[in-house]
């Protein structure tokens, strides 16, 4: 039975029910592909005719989040079906099997294959997986060892390679080796691929460049450029042929076009080479023309000169380069041989290092799996292994989500385990227009190959189904997406022709609304050019850079949407939860950028200056945070105190507390020795420096002694403590953790410190040990540009504008998208490296001659450079498509240009063509997103401003009859210079002075009374606390206000200080804190006996986590009983146990205060905070445990007392992890009792 609550389209039904074939579902953005995938899985397991158990289906995704979401959705659907048919044994069975189902990431599946078949390959079953950081460190170590060995061997091939490509310190060659190694891992058999690409350079005597794969690519590329030149000449010819006075230009231009046409129609390399050599250009006839047509004459001459320059460039840089190819290859071959051998040697060195540590990396997971699933036949061809055939027999159907992101290794794996011919069982779903992970070795060609070859007819064994009905975005956005991409996405740029069949169809349901909602797509273009008439004494701060200018534009646009002026209506968005329109909130707006580095900080600053709350999801900036720099400086001087820079940094920090004057006094003692040695001399009253120390007063001497003693103590302690515990000890002992919490942005700063602590905890598990190695580990992270980004502290419901990269937005949707930085140049730096790599075309090296100190690109590098540029631009095209399709209700595009007139002229020139598609040549030579969007909009009736600003008049063929609507705005940089505060003040004063009060003041009497008697509409809201702890909620739900059922902010009761208490022993609350601390730090692998636990408690005393008196309050027997209890045994069995986990969660105020009017307080939020004592994973679900140490009476009263607290813990945990909390327990230490509060 099909889900009766969902209205599936006919194509969706086909995707759900088509049986017994390899099925490719090309699902456009927002077309419900996940829903279709889930429904197909459901139909497989609930269909009586098939009777397939859910564990017999393999469903692979590319992220853990996607796998968890899919499993959850399948589980929810099965549960709902079971509610309707509660006696169904099959549904009960499928729900029971769900936890054993194979809905997982591709890496998880590969790992499962390895663990079940490790005996088939040379792998210890106790292996572990190293993380990216440890992998990078190991690679670096392996590479340095390898280079040292090669230098010691004095290997001539290696020495020549290092001379040619190594740079000053071999770093460039090391980068090439690492890059080529990583690139080769994208091949199913990396070593074979390296050997194959090396053969390309070992030319035979019968070598003919025209027969090579490189010549074919180059011919195609040259043809595209020739068509671009022809198009330019045709356009200018069309412009001048009806202009009187330029008749003498017509014949030369026609002749040039004929010559280019002849080159375009040539099909062989030798012929095109000969024609280019013969190519010549006639001189244009000279004739005096009327001044009125001079601009057209100049334009014609300039265009022809530009085309001539391009054709000569093709001849000199490409065509004639092939003459030296044979000689070049003879010299390059030994170098490439040395390089490929060096990479294979690195492979062995790195592999051995991993084997020594009994670990594998993420690339190994796929390659070991492939090794298990493949074997060779007598001819050496790859066939499925015995293990692969077992999986092929076991899995009834294989589902691949996001198929467009598959790589070649994954493709072979899936081919090995999927059935063939009449039993074909492969279901692939994705959208090649959203393939944006080529930099991770994704191969969109795999999708395209099937997309172009599979049949749409029913009954085909290789069938294709297209889903094009978009259920996400308003029609205005869908129309704009189709309008732009029909013009710009083609086989050359985008790798797919975006035609009518690829167009999205608007199917989203948005109720009609008369207010301010939806609307035209907006394009905002800012001219970066400075105003030539600006004043010489203009404030330098007002000379804004381009990023800040654009950020101010965006800030003004956001304020216009969220905080409209009195004469404007508030912008409304449709909220599915309330099934109605509501006013837009900051959280409805997302600013997307191609890359956030350098851009996000400027946007955050400008938006904050405009009073807009904003959060930037960046992957940089962590190591530059002052709190992280301070702690790292402290660790550096604990390891080696003779380093002056970190030492001074620490002395000046709040941990040291030394002033600049103090540092000057210390340096004067002796300028030749380190600061550490100076402090040591002061502490020990050194006789050698007796006279130099006379100016050190008692205050500074005391300060020095205190700091020096602490430093010595830390240096002793770090030897005996794990690095993570030592870092936390530093935080608490110095009070630095609390200090940064009181600074501006304190929550973020504390989160950053916790992140460093967690990083240290992870480091503890890797093969490198000790403080020195940890510092080295951090330094390598910084030097390798592996900045981690600030710790994430915001939940998804925080009311802030978000800034994120387009890549991070993939798979998400937002009411309002502002695509910023559309004028930022494409990053093409990778295609300029000294050696280029390509899967099909192999290696593209520079020709280098160390003796003559010359280098230049070989013809092969030229080919690879052009091919990689095309692939990069195609990726950028798909990234733009992803950005556009994130928007649900409003799309705004912003960008800056260097010179508005020149830019608009370039756009109009690119748009000056007869076809609907923009010329490939123009698309290839575009510099940024605006260069694609601008020409398309210039041909739209709404793009009139672009055509008007353009200094040269083009008679563009407008695309009429298109449903899309655009608003184009053009600004000068001067529009965004902020008004100085004093000018604002003067304006206000002037307005006040201009007021003329009527002598009859009685007319103001009523207004005065009205204002004095005014009452605040939201008075109750002002009494509601903005933040609660979960413990406060527990008390709050026990109290009832007799008047209105609402309890507002409570009075504050201060605890009696210790010196006023009669008893100096620990209070019950303090004993509880100590027990929680022990339970947080105890090693659960060492809790089998009294002695083991007692030893751990003693260690906490030694490390100063607790005092002797606090340790005596701990009942070791109570802890033993806990770990011998049912819940304790389950916890010990779990691989993932988390303790003392802080959280923040936003809830609606009306949830706590039931009597508040819903229509007024619906958007009022309250922040809930708390710390979860413990939770652990069990069968991919969570078990929550909360300890209680206080004495309890009746169990039922305890249950009632803590029910609310545990409810919010569970709710927060599910939100925090995205996983289901299966059970919630209270453990009562006073009764050794487990209380189930699920």
Curated annotation (Swiss-Prot):
GO terms for molecular function: 3'-5' DNA helicase activity; 3'-5' exonuclease activity; ATP binding; ATP hydrolysis activity; double-stranded DNA binding. Gene3D superfamilies: 1.10.274.50, 3.90.320.10, P-loop containing nucleotide triphosphate hydrolases. Residues 6-474 form the UvrD-like helicase ATP-binding domain. Its cofactor is Mg(2+). Its EC number is 3.1.-.-, 5.6.2.4. One of its GO terms (biological process) is double-strand break repair via homologous recombination. NCBIfam families: addA_Gpos (TIGR02785). Heterodimer of AddA and AddB/RexB. This is ATP-dependent helicase/nuclease subunit A.
